[in-house]
Swiss-Prot record:
Family membership: Belongs to the phosphohexose mutase family.
Chain positions found as Phosphoserine: S102
PANTHER family assigned to the protein according to its UniProt record, in alphabetical order: PHOSPHOGLUCOMUTASE (ALPHA-D-GLUCOSE-1,6-BISPHOSPHATE-DEPENDENT), PHOSPHOHEXOSE MUTASE
Keyword Hydrolase: no
Coiled-coil zones: none
Protein name: Phosphoglucosamine mutase
One GO MF term: phosphoglucosamine mutase activity
Gene3D superfamilies for this protein: Alpha-D-Glucose-1,6-Bisphosphate, subunit A, domain 3, Alpha-D-phosphohexomutase, C-terminal domain
Any GO BP annotation: UDP-N-acetylglucosamine biosynthetic process
């Protein structure tokens, strides 16, 4: 059965446009509360959010909906998505809720759920929640209405967890780093993690005002970080996104190090330590150079559909401990249950300490193929199936690339976009072919 509201990463859209409205969030809290009360033991849910101004409005609406269903809520305040996943598990909550649109601008927002194991909900439960959304809303008997409390030490708990993911006794003394928190939910967490591990920390994007999340800062726009690393002669820079589940880094030369390269650095380190066997999971968008580098380690490289939930599903299916996306979602399954930007950065820094090499040196084991990604924005979500013009141009591009490249056309799971990706050995050819194909997509849907 096809889901009406849930996409690849929960429910997301523009604030004020249905379903990202207070009345829908009230009903969603009630529907989810009914499902959780029926399907899972206990009646307690955690709610965290990023720093968008609309988060406060939706937090109140969800809280009221859960209360009407007889479910208690514990409010975490601004908290990274991976922190909510971790706290849901360790505090033995029935479920965790994150109010966030991740890397999107402030005027978008969304909701995603975690189960008691800290994993994203399976499709069956999302479908059941949608079923309840279609039912009349009722309120439990008054004495059973849920209560709301606030957890005041949530950030401290998560900071200690992050530090525990590297060897006890390891520290970053003498390392100068710049941390960009994207004016998002890591602003009060990430700087403390790295400074408590004795790094010298400069910060960017740590003054959220409700409107500036992801605005020319963070993992989706590392240019300011790149310049700051160079100006301050820092060893590296760390860029997180608005909800803290993505990581992009900058080396001491000011070169951006993306999720594919970081995944290789961690895989290479784990393999050298004898901790990594079997396969590493990427996505259809992962750079061909990553696949080749992983295979040179004697490991299998598997490609999942785009989206960290699909990466995790494939990791679980094949027993993989490491996976990720070029966008910066990296999952270290022996440490986390979802993408975690801070934890991933700590694994990279730990390898810098162990190896005595710079980030620039560590990434050299992978040769990135030139890759161009063009986002073609449309008025609404569409299907690419049976569009003759697009299929014709796609076939022409594939023929020109031959065996030395890849082409991928993919609708975004969260926005009305078609993502056009072309990858090959020659950068000029890749750019020309990607622009040609993106132009064909735009023309096909402009009428």
């Amino acid at each position: 059965m096809k889901k009406e509201y849930f996409g690849t990463d929960g429910i997301r859209g523009r604030v004020g446009d249905y379903p990202i409205t207070p009345d829908f969030m009230l009903k969603l809290g009630w529907a989810a509360g009914c499902v959780f009360a029926r399907e899972m033991p206990g009646r307690r849910v955690l709610i965290g959010k990023d720093t968008r101004i609309s988060g406060y409005m939706f937090e109140s609406a969800l809280e009221a909906g859960f209360s009407a269903a007889g479910v208690d809520t514990q409010l975490l305040g601004p908290m990274p998505t991976p922190a909510v996943a971790y706290l849901t598990r360790t505090l033995r909550a029935q479920a965790g809720v994150v109010i966030s649109a991740s890397h999107n601008p402030y005027y978008d927002n969304g909701i995603k759920f975690f189960g008691p194991d800290g994993m994203k909900l399976p499709d069956e439960l999302e479908l059941l929640i949608e079923d309840y959304l279609g039912r009349p809303m009722t309120t439990v008997e008054c004495s059973h209405i849920g209560k709301a409390t606030r957890i005041v030490d949530a950030a401290g708990r998560y900071i200690e967890f992050c530090k525990s993911t590297i060897p006890l006794g390891m520290h970053f003394s003498g390392m100068k780093i710049v941390v960009d928190c994207a004016h998002g939910s890591t602003y009060h967490v990430a700087p403390d993690v790295f400074s408590e591990l004795r790094a010298t920390v400069s910060t960017l994007g740590v003054a959220p005002d409700g409107l500036n999340i992801n605005d020319r800062v963070g993992a989706t726009d590392p240019e300011n970080l790149r310049q700051t690393v160079l100006e301050e002669n820092a060893d590296l820079g760390i860029a997180l996104d608005g909800d803290g589940d993505r990581l992009i880094m900058v080396d001491h030369r000011g070169e951006v190090v993306d999720g594919d390269e970081l995944l290789f650095v961690i895989a290479n380190a784990r393999h050298a330590e004898g901790e990594l066997k079997g396969s590493v999971v990427g996505t259809l968008m992962s750079n061909l150079g990553l696949e080749q580098a992983i295979r040179r380690l004697g490991l299998e490289f598997r490609r999942a559909a785009v989206g960290d939930r699909y990466v995790m599903e494939m990791m679980l299916e094949h027993g993989s401990m490491l996976g990720g996306e070029g966008s910066g979602h990296i999952i270290c399954r022996d440490r986390t249950t979802t993408g975690d930007g801070i934890v991933s950065a700590l694994q990279v820094l730990a390898e810098i300490v162990r190896s005595g090499k710079t980030l620039h040196e560590l990434k050299q084991g992978m040769r990135k193929y030139p890759q161009r990604l063009v986002n073609v924005r449309l008025a609404e979500r569409v299907s690419l199936a049976s569009v003759p013009l697009v299929q014709k141009v796609k076939a022409e591009v594939e023929a020109e690339l031959g065996d030395s490249g890849r082409v991928l056309l993919r609708p975004s799971g969260t926005e009305p976009l078609i993502r056009v990706m072309v990858e090959g050995a020659d950068e000029g050819q890749v750019r020309e072919l990607a622009d040609r194909l993106a132009g064909a997509v735009a023309r096909a849907f402009s009428a």
